[in-house]
Curated annotation (Swiss-Prot):
This is Crenactin. Monomer. The crenactin monomers polymerize into right-handed helical filaments, with 8 subunits per complete turn of the helix. Forms single-stranded filaments under high salt concentrations and double-stranded filaments under low salt concentrations. Interacts with arcadin-1 and arcadin-2. Forms the backbone of an actin-like archaeal cytoskeleton, which is involved in cell shape determination. Has ATPase activity. Shows highest activity towards ATP or GTP as nucleotide, and only residual activity on UTP, CTP and dNTPs. GO terms for cellular component: cytoplasm; cytoskeleton. InterPro entries: Actin (IPR004000), ATPase_NBD (IPR043129).
């Protein structure tokens, strides 16, 4: 095939968003991406009676990915903790973690295998991969190497990589903005002016995982230690009962003075139900607040009594702040942007990611807030001048906006632009 046409790109651009918890993937033709958990199960320590029933090709690979496939073999593996591998921490795989890279390669293979192509005109996928803005250079190289290796198994025409916050800005058609991407592992605050302004990148070492962790501790306190061990159950409870307070102290005061108003139940299965009792109704607000600001006495007491840790971490030359609140992170990010363009960049703050997907139950509008309102209130308290000039909004699809931006980027990026390690732009063409 000669020149790749726009019509071709509208069919065969393929987006992959490698998140800490989920990989979202699929061609540009989808309304929304497919999702698979970012994990893999190594088939080690298997009893002989189990090995006999596993297909030889699966056994030979020694590794399975895909939600159904992992569940299928999970009960057969003796040491689940050793053999169930989550390759990304804060969106980054360690350079020397061979098992993590095996899982990422298998996930890349799995995502492409879901979309076989029989079109005789098919010259290969245009793959646009979104990685954490914290991803170091070695991770870019390793991802390119993975797709180089897969090119012999799947037709891949070219591969490009972009940072997740830039993908969100593209999906939102925002040229000047601050993207606040809240994932499971971390929160990335990234100023954008046509491209990512790396000097202004601020990262927080918390996200949806910390909301899960405090939910787990609350479940233990109210007598559901068995359920607290199951990550799936914890996630469901968090989503169902977690609340973001407008202001934490006022919300706790309201819940303690009228606990019946905040009592709730969650049915996890036909035979399992979780009830948040009156004396713990106020803790619902801690679940949402920990994402926005963990600097409260009530949250710190849970941290001290549990294995939950909120502390700084370092990835490459970037410090991830554990206790910095989201509003302070936005202000810090903007201070590192050239004064000349600060006001333009600050004109809109766009929230994205599952960590910002919170709802306000009917009748609780006086004490609970959605993410946009919570950030506005915090900015008004920290910087009234900034708050008066900025529009804060949530993307329409918080979980999918990175993938959507990736496929738009892959569709629009000129194929004449070859990859540059310096600018981190362009296409890499697999060795043929």
């Amino acid at each position: 095939m000669g020149v790749i046409s726009d019509a071709y790109r509208l069919k065969y651009t393929f987006g992959v968003d490698f998140g800490t918890s989920y990989v979202k993937y699929g061609p540009i033709t989808l309304n929304e991406p497919k999702m698979v958990q970012t994990r893999g199960l190594f088939l080690r320590d298997l009893p002989e009676s189990v090995k006999m029933r596993i297909p030889p090709d699966v056994l030979a690979r020694g590794l399975v990915v895909g939600d159904e496939e992992v569940r299928k073999y999970l009960s057969s593996v003796r040491d689940v903790q050793r053999n169930l591998k989550y390759p990304l921490k804060d969106g980054v795989a360690r350079r020397d973690d061979e098992e993590a890279w095996r899982v990422l390669k298998e996930l890349a293979r799995y995502t492409l295998a879901q979309f076989p192509v029989s079109d005789p005109e098919f010259a290969g996928w245009l793959v646009a991969v979104a990685l954490s803005a914290l991803a170091p250079d070695y991770m870019y190289k390793a991802i390119f190497d993975i797709y180089d290796e897969l090119a012999s198994e799947f037709k891949i025409y070219a591969v490009t990589i972009l940072p997740q916050p830039l993908a969100v800005a593209i999906a939102e058609n925002a040229v000047n903005c601050v993207i606040v991407e809240g994932g499971h592992g971390n929160i990335q605050v990234a100023p954008i002016s046509f491209a990512l302004i790396r000097e202004g990148l601020v990262a927080l070492n918390r996200g949806g995982a910390e909301a899960n962790a405090i939910t787990r501790e609350i479940l233990k306190d109210i007598g559901y230690s068995d359920i607290a061990r199951e990550e799936y159950a914890v996630e469901v409870v968090k989503r169902a009962v977690g609340l973001v307070p407008r202001r934490l102290k006022e919300a706790i005061r309201a819940a303690k003075s009228d606990p019946d108003r905040f009592v709730t139940k969650v049915r996890l299965s036909p035979v399992v139900e979780v009830e948040i009792p009156r004396e713990y109704a106020w803790t619902r607000f801690l679940i949402g607040e920990i994402v926005f600001d963990p600097n409260h006495e009530e949250i710190k007491s849970y941290i001290e009594q549990s294995r939950l840790r909120i502390e700084n971490a370092v990835i490459g030359d970037v410090t991830l702040y554990g206790e910095m609140d989201v509003a302070s992170a936005i202000i810090t990010s903007l201070r590192n942007v050239s004064v000349e363009i600060q006001e333009r960049v600050a004109s809109q703050i766009i929230l994205s990611g599952g960590a910002f997907s919170w709802r306000v139950p009917p009748g609780m509008e006086d004490v609970a807030a959605d993410s946009v309102t919570r950030v506005k209130i915090a900015l008004e308290e920290k910087s009234p001048a900034l708050a008066s000039k900025v529009e804060v909004r949530l993307v329409s699809e918080p979980q999918y906006s990175v993938w959507r931006g990736a496929v738009i980027y892959g569709y629009a990026l000129p194929l004449s632009l070859e990859w540059s390690d310096t600018t981190r732009e362009g296409w890499r063409f697999p060795r043929r």
